[in-house]
Every structure is written in structure tokens, then in C-alpha cells.
């Protein structure tokens, strides 16, 4: 699946520039997932875009991450990082990031953007692919008439819905937003996750609200989506499967924008 940038509405980038930001908060939410908050120079990216980051632990390695916040003049950034099995750089970001670290940020890129004329929006997030879609949601709150939006959030197990409390609050506060949590299994694995046990909160999704996965199948139950704009972000397999099944069930490819990592 390949989209021509001219057809996707990719946001043109300016000359290469580097900005710096300092880590002010590190929140380990799961054994493999960390939320990193930074404040620094204003980074001129668009909501939904990713940036390249270099960290003091690996100054010569580049990692592309999505901001979970829209750009702000006060320089606030938030990244959701999940350790990839066998990926020691992502694992180090989860375990070794500390407050006070200075990150170098370059190269905003991407085309996950909401059409101004969109009346109905379908957002599909696999894992930490939620980050750019959350940034877009927060940006939509600035519109006088946001589009009716369904956000599908996919995870393997219920405890992998790492932002369940935040999503439940958003769903309650925004009348135009419907959250659809999707899990491959409705039962958590037997082995414990100490980080989940430490930060578990009462706010979240009730078991009866969880939709059986996989994510692509859950989204396809609403197909064909002939009039909606669809944005998909997450792991390569989940994204490709979702786009393929949507197209196969009658959704026009031109309605879909997607990015995978």
C-alpha cells in the first residue's frame, strides 16, 4: 500500500532545524511503556506529525516519535514510548530516560491531518499509535464544530490500554467523541506487570465496554466507510491489515491516511 504524497496532503517541511527540550517528567505506565514530558523551544510541527529525537543516552542514534500534544508556544511536548522486542534503543528510552535529560529534536514529518470539511472522523490507534491521534483530538477541541469522531484503540490485553483513564475522561467530556477500546483477549496474562499494579486507577473502561479484536476486524464491522475520513496509526502489521480490510470491504482508499512504525 503506497500513497502519493500529493494525494495524502503531506505537510511540506522547511529547512532542517534543530530544537532542544528538557525532560521534566517520566511516567512509567507499564513494564514496556513510558510517557515522557518535555519543555523547551517551540517546535513548529503540525498536530499528528512525528519528529526525530536524539537523547543523551544514544546521541548518535535517531528515533522517530509522535507528539501526543499539539504544538504549543510554551514548548510542551509529550511522547509515548513502547519498548519493541529486540529493539534496545526503544527499550533504553523506556527504562533509562530521566528528568533533566536534554533531547535534540529535528525533522517534523507526516500527513495525519484532519480535513477542515470532515463531518465524521474515524481514528484507529494500535498501541502507542494513540499519541498522534490524541494530539489531533486535542487540536479538534479548538474548532467551533468538531467532526463526529470514533476513536478505536487497540491492545492485546486490557492492561495494555495504557491510557484508559485519560481516554475515559476525554470520552465523558467531549460529546462528539466516542471511544471504542478493542482487545485481542479480554483477560490479562498471568505474569504480573508491577508498573501496571502501581499505577492502576479506578477510572477506565468496564469489562463490558471492551470490544473483541483484532483491531482491524472491529473497525471493519462499520465498513464500508464511504463518507468518513479515516486516520490509522500503529505497528506495521496492524496498520496494513486495517487498511487492507477496509479497502476490501468497500472503503475508498482516498478516504484513508495512515502511518506505521
Show which residues each predicted segment covers.
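Short, conserved phosphate/pyrophosphate- and ester-handling motifs at nucleotide-, phospho-/glycolipid
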Residues: 48, 129, 235
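Ferredoxin-reductase
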Residues: 4-101, 155-157, 182-186
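Short, glycine-rich nucleotide/cofactor-binding loops
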Residues: 121-131
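Structural motif
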Residues: 120-122, 150, 229
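A short, basic/flexible loop-to-alpha-helix module at the beginning of a structural domain
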Residues: 106-119
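Reductase modules of NAD(P)H-dependent flavoproteins
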Residues: 15-17, 152, 157-261
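Histidine-anchored nucleotide/phosphate-binding helix
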Residues: 130-142
Amino acid at each position: 500500500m503506497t500513497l502519493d504524497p500529493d494525494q495524502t496532503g503531506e505537510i511540506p517541511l522547511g529547512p532542517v532545524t534543530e530544537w532542544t527540550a528538557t525532560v521534566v517528567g517520566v511516567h512509567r505506565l507499564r513494564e514496556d511503556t513510558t510517557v515522557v514530558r518535555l519543555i523547551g523551544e517551540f517546535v513548529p510541527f503540525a498536530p499528528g506529525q512525528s519528529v526525530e529525537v536524539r537523547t543523551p543516552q544514544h546521541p548518535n542514534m535517531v528515533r522517530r516519535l509522535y507528539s501526543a500534544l499539539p504544538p504549543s508556544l510554551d514548548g510542551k511536548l509529550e511522547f509515548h514510548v513502547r519498548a519493541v522486542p529486540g529493539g534496545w534503543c526503544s527499550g533504553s528510552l523506556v527504562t533509562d530516560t530521566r528528568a533533566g535529560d536534554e533531547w535534540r529534536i529535528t525533522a517534523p514529518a507526516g500527513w495525519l491531518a484532519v480535513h477542515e470539511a470532515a463531518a465524521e472522523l474515524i481514528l484507529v490507534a494500535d498501541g502507542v499509535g494513540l499519541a498522534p491521534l490524541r494530539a489531533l483530538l486535542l487540536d479538534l477541541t479548538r474548532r467551533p464544530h468538531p467532526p463526529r469522531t470514533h476513536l478505536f484503540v487497540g491492545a492485546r490485553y486490557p492492561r495494555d490500554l495504557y491510557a484508559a483513564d485519560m481516554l475515559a475522561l476525554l470520552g465523558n467530556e467531549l460529546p462528539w467523541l466516542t471511544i471504542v477500546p478493542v482487545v485481542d483477549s479480554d483477560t490479562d496474562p498471568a505474569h504480573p506487570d508491577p508498573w501496571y499494579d502501581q499505577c492502576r486507577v479506578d477510572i477506565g473502561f468496564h469489562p463490558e465496554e471492551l470490544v473483541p479484536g483484532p483491531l482491524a476486524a472491529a473497525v471493519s464491522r462499520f465498513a464500508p466507510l464511504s463518507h468518513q475520513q479515516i486516520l490509522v496509526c500503529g505497528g506495521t502489521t496492524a496498520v496494513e491489515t486495517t487498511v487492507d480490510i477496509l479497502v476490501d470491504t468497500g472503503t475508498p482508499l482516498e478516504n484513508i491516511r495512515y502511518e506505521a512504525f
